[in-house]
Amino acid sequence: MKTVAVTEDFRDFPTFDAMMSEAFPPEELFLPSDMAKLANVRIQAYYGDDGAPVGMAVPILLPDAVFLELLVVDSRQRGKGYGSQIVNQLLERFPGQTILGYVERPDPSRPDNEQRLRRIRFYERLGFTVHYIHTRQWGIDFLVIAIGKGQDDR
């Protein structure tokens, strides 16, 4: 898998913007082409061995941790291990650091509840701890996830 640092002149914005639009509901959508304009954001695009775009991650460096603002894998590439590879690369890139993120809180009344549960299981398989502390953004409840220093490492 090849990793590319995304800059404002990134040629594949349309592909990755479409990937995001498919993966996230409108209230959570922040397109990579808009994210790249922010000074503190470092977007990483990932490509398979065949050169096809497979995913994207947005790690934000904080003083004592790394915040994983975004992880997305193209729907046609899911189930092939790319998400795990991306997370493992981030763990290698930031050794000894706590990596924090968030996932949507399960809600049986929501039509996307199964997708929310799948995301939680994905992170748990990789060794993340789900903290039942929630935060609310865009009218959505999220749970905090973490791995690394002070967490139940894998």
Feature names for model-found ranges:
Residues M1-L31, Y47:
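Short amphipathic alpha-helix that is part of the acyltransferase structural core
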Residues R119-H131:
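Conserved acetyl-CoA-binding loop of GNAT-fold acetyltransferases
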Residues A36-G48:
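A short helix-loop-beta-strand connector motif used in the catalytic cores of GNAT acetyltransferases and
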Residues N40, D64, Q137-D141:
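Short acidic/glycine-enriched loop/turn segments that link adjacent beta-strands
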Residues V73, G79-R93:
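Conserved acetyl-CoA-binding loop-helix of GNAT-fold acetyltransferases
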Residues F94-Q115:
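Conserved GNAT acetyl-CoA-binding A-motif
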Residues A45, G51-I60, A65-V72:
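Conserved beta-strand in the GNAT
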Residues Q115-R116, Y132-R154:
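C-terminal "cap" of GNAT-fold acetyltransferases
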